[in-house]
């Protein structure tokens, strides 16, 4: 049983530097000397043994410390030898414990170790950074704003570059607003009015939705991403976002670039101009909460689980609302839309060729297929095979049900009138299917059991799905993604795991494990293999993400590129090159120094305190405030590591400078104010006998 000891008793128990101290760390006993524990001033151990901190002792008299003994072992080894041997301990855990014990030299060394994998400029996949835009002050009219806006009689700064800004995440008025946080919400967490809620892309355009406004960026080949449109401030938070940037074969005068936002039952639609700016087309009402908002061609579609569907036709400029069965899923291909309903029916809507019935002015909605068990269709995916004849495409539809069943139905071009035929059935899920994807090579299904994924290989003959040998099981894995209970991790619609990508190419899942995570994992949708992981360059949490298939350059040999877009809690937007990541899949990266090699190099010097904002660890005493390796003269050899020690000067002795060997000699002469760690084993000299001249410049973390 641990017995408390008062601070006064701790002071009285001070002993000689060679006194043996017994520690009980988390139930494991350690024995070391007082000198080993106290050579770093103002640390946890020096305060403990000097009586400034009350102690607990177990039944044997050992000082009890309620910390992890596994992590304490390499820390004690560092205090003994001044060498770091992690012994399989995770770097972040070791850094956390070093900060707890107040071991400033070890903390600095571990921070440099972490810089191996972290950079404010990202990694090789980092492709661009867009700072937060200017926040619209008022909604004076229903016309949109673009470019610099007048705020207080002066133009607000708008950064129009896809490079890293000098002040990460604090450009523009929105960035400054984040410094003055709103009062805490009822859940106790601060509100994030400027975080990215939704992000979507189409061809060379990006739409980013914040709480009360949205912006659009356009990619220009020579100048990069440019701000093209900024909406006025809205009175309600944006919950859904849709963008279309190019329509092939559209009639003259049609809107070919549009962006729409919705919340509740209200939908706002804007037309975008290629040269920048935009105008409001109109405000539409669905009458019930909008749960899905998307474009099929240049037709805007809004659906609700209640069974109501709204279509805005770009040709007739007509908004039509119609009731069907309660909608539980949807998918689109070409110019037609499929709706999965709770009664097991799959409805077919051609939104371009036959938008309205001639008699009753209703949408042309027809039942395409009904599930044999009449289970609700909770996920839909349609695949159009390449056109092999004048009669049309072979239509393949995969869908999942509320009972966990996955079915594949097909329709021949010659048998359009008879409807699709059931092709395959898989009963591998015990929870409702939430996502499904039928691509050229794979069938992928996801169920509600923590995003459990099952995949199959699809065999095709002349582009059409084949029964010999049919679909074969490929992989089973999970994409764990926890959702926030208070909504502070971002809008749920902006954190869709996917799969993303064209159906004739490799598709990927995007995994954000916890709501406030700053790191995303990109995994192949077919096997679950990790493609890469990206971490926000400014350290802010990622609140929304999507994958953009961007058009290639007009230059010879260029090809389309695939980008991962991540919206951050501070309002910024980062872009990552997934094409490069996919090309390097399976290759072993050739790096520079390993962590062990870096630690070996850092043992040859003392690190000065960080002057940047990334570390704020004050130096408690002059001995730990060394900004460089001090020496008595410019030709002094490096003591304590290699060579022979030179006699210390009196001035250096009074300041506590010199190598720890010099300080150890002073300690042996009886100087109580000079303490150092035990002398480590001498290192073999790599020189040819010439002394190493100490560097004149300050060594700090940025030197490595």
From Swiss-Prot:
The modification Phosphothreonine is found at residue 163. A motif (PXXXPR) lies at residues 618-623, 678-683. One of its GO terms (molecular function) is identical protein binding. Keywords: Acetylation, Lysosome, Phosphoprotein, Repeat, WD repeat. InterPro entries: BTB/POZ_dom, SHKBP1/KCTD3, SHKBP1_KCTD3_BTB_POZ, SKP1/BTB/POZ_sf, T1-type_BTB, WD40/YVTN_repeat-like_dom_sf, WD40_repeat_dom_sf. It is found in: Lysosome. Residues 611-631 have a biased composition (Low complexity). Gene3D superfamilies: Potassium Channel Kv1.1, Chain A (3.30.710.10), YVTN repeat-like/Quinoprotein amine dehydrogenase (2.130.10.10). GO terms for biological process: positive regulation of epidermal growth factor receptor signaling pathway; protein homooligomerization. The modification N-acetylalanine is found at residue 2. SMART domains: BTB (SM00225). Inhibits CBL-SH3KBP1 complex mediated down-regulation of EGFR signaling by sequestration of SH3KBP1. Binds to SH3KBP1 and prevents its interaction with CBL and inhibits translocation of SH3KBP1 to EGFR containing vesicles upon EGF stimulation. This is SH3KBP1-binding protein 1. The lineage of its organism: Eukaryota, Metazoa, Chordata, Craniata, Vertebrata. The gene is Shkbp1.
